[in-house]
């Protein structure tokens, strides 16, 4: 996967939003984006979606812009209001505090992008 650190930052950012707002569609997106033990996403399509987003932006190391492009591409499949609002907020540079927190977490290995199976 291209720019795995950027992917982890974007995942953590979305996870922070989900933890504050608990949108169903965002939970589904995060579930598919969660990483398996081998480092690949639970839904293999997200690896190519992320790689395509990274290829489309001018600076492949700019994970914020890659996240914006990822959401644009995701919404081309079908518009989902909750995801569209996150995209609008990113384009307007809102919630940068959450983005910066996500960057810090990933840089210090405080994130957990791995899929967990829980049995009760």
Q: Which stretches of residues belong to each language-model region?
A:
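Short intrinsically disordered terminal tails
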Residues: 1, 41, 58, 117-120
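Residue-level detector of well-ordered alpha-helical segments, enriched
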Residues: 5-9, 25, 46-49, 62-66, ...
